[in-house]
Amino acid sequence: MRLTPREIDKLLVVVAADLAYRRKERGLKLNYPESIAIITYEILEGARDGKNVAELMELGKNILSAEDVMDGIADMISDIQVEATFPDGTKLVTIHQPIH
């Protein structure tokens, strides 16, 4: 199987998000990389499902809460930018204050 660097990056996001979801299900609070992975994964999948940029920006704010993450993590993540592929091309989705 031959993957482009972009496809490898997306695959790594999926694996990291899967691990993070498993830890969350076990009741563990998420760290910084786990939080970023879950939000990024949901944005990429939302774009694949046909949601537009505005919908994804709103979705990104409702994926995780401060109760889901370790102390201080919500304050560390002020913005997340995800380059997502839409039917009409690639667009940058920015989520401001994704965890509150």
UniProtKB/Swiss-Prot annotation:
Isomerase in keyword set: no
Alphabetized SUPFAM superfamilies for the sequence: Urease, gamma-subunit
GO cellular component, one term: cytoplasm
Enzyme Commission numbers on file: 3.5.1.5
GO BP: any one term: urea catabolic process
Keywords: Cytoplasm, Hydrolase
Subunit comment: Heterotrimer of UreA (gamma), UreB (beta) and UreC (alpha) subunits. Three heterotrimers associate to form the active enzyme.
NCBIfam families xrefs: PRK13241.1 (NF009712), urease_gam (TIGR00193)
Protein name (record): Urease subunit gamma
Gene: ureA
